[in-house]
Regions:
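Conserved glycine-rich Rossmann-like NAD(P)H-binding loop of the short-chain dehydrogenase/reductase
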Residues: 24-41
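C-terminal helical subdomain
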Residues: 175, 195-231
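Conserved mid-core segment of classical short-chain dehydrogenase/reductases
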Residues: 78, 88-104
Length: 255
């Protein structure tokens, strides 16, 4: 029976990963900050799906709290077959803000923790020649809409680089790059979404279903829905000056 470790595993895309993986019989290790929510969700999953659910309460913005999670990822006695680096949040602080503390915390959670856990998983999985890593990135990483785009551009490039380092063996790395997903993500970051057309939104169950299918195929980039595949193809091939101009217009309507 496989075991999956999911960071940010009690809400949004992370919770959907937990549900779909539990439904197929995988045991889970859930990582999140709120111990009460972890315990509640773990009980729900165990009762509904009959799988084992381990919980780790950790703030991934604190390096000392990331390291025990990395140790669990690297365990030989209880191997992790799938790492889902999902923990993250929206950022409304501008890059030119006088107080960059929120941006620094975003880097700590969505870059440093991803790097530490990805390294631990990569070593452990390579030693067994088996395993998969999903790093939840974003279509925002292909455009230039400020702080979140910058962080997610790193996540995507890092995932491609890690896949290259691990080679063509039994370990895969996938950067999941969803577009606008129906969760509480934008509201929590106070990001206005009224200007985003309804057809641009994607349900999180569809995002996760497509991601797991892409992982099974060994894909390095997973971009859910044909609409966003076309958009990202354009973003990667249009002149960067055009991408920046469009990004500025998109960003101006969200603050």
């Amino acid at each position: 029976m496989a075991t999956a470790l999911i960071t940010g595993g009690t809400s949004g895309i992370g919770a959907e990963f937990a549900r779909q993986l539990a439904a197929r019989g995988d045991d889970l290790v859930l990582v999140a900050r709120n111990p009460d929510r972890l315990a509640e969700f773990a009980t729900e999953l165990k009762e509904r799906y009959g799988v084992a659910v381990e919980t780790i309460s950790a703030d991934l913005g604190v390096r000392e709290e990331v390291l025990p999670v990395a140790a669990r990822v690297a365990s030989r006695e209880q191997p992790v077959d799938l790492l889902v680096n999902n923990a993250g949040f929206g950022l409304s602080t501008r890059l030119t803000a006088e107080d960059t503390t929120p941006l620094e915390y975003g880097v700590e959670v969505m870059i440093r923790a991803v790097l530490i856990l990805g390294a631990a998983a990569g070593r452990a999985m390579r030693s067994r020649d088996h395993g998969a890593i999903i790093n939840v990135s974003s279509t925002a990483g292909f455009v230039t809409m400020g702080r979140y785009s910058a962080i997610k551009a790193w996540v995507t490039t890092y995932s491609e680089s890690l896949a290259g380092e691990l080679g063509a063996g039994g370990v895969t790395v996938t950067a999941l790059c969803p577009g606008y997903v129906r969760t509480q993500f934008h509201q929590r970051a106070s990001i206005r979404t009224g200007s985003i057309p309804g057809p641009m939104w994607v349900d999180r169950d569809k995002v996760v279903t497509e991601a797991l299918a892409d992982v099974a195929k060994g894909k390095i980039l997973s971009i859910p829905t044909r609409r966003f595949k076309v958009m990202i193809f354009a973003a990667r091939h249009f002149p960067r000056s055009a991408v920046r101009a469009v990004s500025r217009r998109m960003a101006s309507g969200r603050h």
